Structure formats: C-alpha cells, structure tokens
C-alpha cells in the first residue's frame, strides 16, 4: 500500500499533464468521478436500498445505491462537460460527451471497487476508520479510497479518449 497509493494518486498529476490548457478540468474530473457516485449511492441507498451489495465487506452498501451512484455520476459528468464548454469557454471548446459518458458509467464502478477494497482492508485489520482527522468521515484515506482507484482510470480513459479534443 505504501507504493500503490502514491502511484495511483500521481495519476491526478499525470492526467493534468495530458492537456496543458485544460489540465485543471481533467484533475477535477478525477475527484468528481470518485466522490459523486459515493454521494449519489448514499442518497439512492437511503431512499431505495433493499438489496445488499456486499454485506460482509460493507453492510450499508446496496445495489440500488450503486445504481443511483452510476446515474448521478453520468449526469454530473455531462453537467461538468456542459459547464466547461458553455460557461468557461463560451461555447468555443466542447468537452467529449463520449469520454465523459465512459468516465461517468465505469468511473462509478471503479470508485465503488476502491471503496470496497479499502473497506475489506479495514475489516481484515478490525478497524472502523483509517483515522479521525475528519470528524464523521474518519481519516484522509477514508475520503480518498475511491480516488485512489478512480484517478488511474480517468487517466487511462483521457489518454485514449481525450476529454477536450
């Protein structure tokens, strides 16, 4: 973990370097693609959650929450593309709908995989949180577990399908 975490987070720096003019936008996508599905899954799970996703690893996660996380991520990725295109660049630059769709759909799954992976590590170590730096949220690693998986994924997608062609 000592090597994997910094290498994975380095993807945020690498994704920023893919496009000199829009690197900050790319880096923000890394974070949003990880945190939006988490929030969407939380609210969808609270409202509609009936079927447990991985009860042994993370008992509160539901299939309905995962679906809500995917839907919310797709919507927010497209909204970010629209904000970038229409508000930041006044319609002169267009974000790739396809690239953001792929990041929205599969980024939510990768984000959930990251969250579940770190939950499994915590369960095997018999700890609830990786720290108590952020009240109610545990440690910094608890907030960035999904980013650690999502950032390399966004880098891969943005390398193959540029977010801003």
Which sequence ranges carry the predicted segments?
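Juxtamembrane boundary at the C-terminal end of a transmembrane helix
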Residues: 82, 156-165
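Single-residue recognition of alpha-helix boundary sites
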Residues: 49, 76, 126, 153-156
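Acidic (Asp/Glu-rich) catalytic motifs at the cytosolic membrane interface
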Residues: 34-50, 54-55, 63-64, 109-149
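Short, conserved aromatic-histidine micro-motifs
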Residues: 89-95, 137-139, 144, 163-164
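Membrane-embedded alpha-helical bundles of polytopic integral membrane proteins
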Residues: 1-105
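Short leucine-rich amphipathic alpha-helices used at interfaces
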Residues: 19, 101-102, 117, 123, ...
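Hydrophobic transmembrane alpha-helices of multi-pass small-molecule transporters
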Residues: 73-74, 143, 150, 159
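Hydrophobic residues in alpha-helical membrane-spanning segments
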Residues: 7, 136, 151-153, 163
């Amino acid at each position: 973990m000592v090597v994997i975490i910094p290498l994975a987070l380095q993807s945020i720096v690498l994704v920023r370097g893919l496009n000199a003019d829009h690197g900050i936008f790319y880096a923000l996508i890394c974070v949003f693609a990880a945190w939006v599905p988490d929030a969407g899954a939380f609210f969808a799970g609270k409202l509609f959650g009936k079927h447990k996703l991985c009860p042994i690893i993370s008992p509160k996660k539901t299939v309905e929450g995962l679906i809500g996380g995917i839907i919310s991520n797709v919507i927010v990725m497209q909204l970010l593309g629209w904000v970038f295109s229409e508000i930041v660049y006044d319609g002169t630059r267009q974000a790739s709908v396809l690239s953001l769709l792929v990041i929205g759909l599969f980024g939510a799954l990768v984000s959930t995989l990251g969250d579940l992976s770190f939950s499994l590590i915590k369960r095997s170590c018999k700890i609830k949180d990786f720290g108590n730096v952020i009240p109610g949220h545990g440690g910094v690693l608890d907030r960035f577990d999904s980013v650690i998986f999502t950032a390399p994924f966004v880098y891969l997608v943005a390398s193959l399908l540029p977010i801003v062609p």
